[in-house]
């Protein structure tokens, strides 16, 4: 059986790539962004499943984890609209979503933080969303 970490990553990826708005706008979802020859060749926008942290919530009878995972949005649109729109797609995909992976029960998933800002290059908009979920091994 896959680890808690792998199960969470797969479930979130599967949910995001199945979102109709993400599909219709051809927004790729990455774990690792392909590295272009130069920054000018990078295709924007895109979504990256980022950092995660796990805390055991085990009891005498259950193996559970509380997970905090970050989803990044990257855009070169001149304003904030595209980043915020994509963050909305992510929220709609994941907030209280029914996630599934073999061997696990996803108890809940909720967004706990969201922000967007201009990256240090002065060109790229960066959206950051944090979701917290509880997952139980079954």
Go through each PLM region and give its residues.
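Acidic-leaning, charged glycine-interspersed low-complexity segments
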Residues: 22-24, 37, 92-138
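Short, cysteine-centered beta-strand-loop-beta hairpins and adjacent loop/turn segments enriched
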Residues: 56-59, 77-81, 135-138
């Amino acid at each position: 059986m896959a680890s808690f970490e792998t199960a969470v990553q797969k479930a979130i990826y599967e949910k995001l790539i199945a979102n109709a708005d993400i599909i219709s706008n051809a927004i790729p979802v990455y774990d690792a962004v392909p590295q272009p020859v130069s920054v000018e060749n990078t295709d924007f926008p895109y979504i990256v499943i980022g950092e995660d942290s796990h805390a055991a919530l085990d009891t005498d009878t259950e193996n559970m984890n509380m997970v905090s995972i970050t989803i990044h949005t990257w855009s070169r649109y001149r304003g904030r609209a595209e980043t915020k729109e994509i963050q909305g797609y992510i929220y709609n995909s994941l907030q209280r979503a029914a996630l599934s992976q073999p061997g696990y029960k996803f108890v809940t998933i909720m967004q706990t933080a969201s922000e967007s800002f201009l990256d240090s290059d002065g060109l790229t908009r960066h959206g950051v969303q944090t979701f917290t979920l509880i997952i139980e091994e079954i």
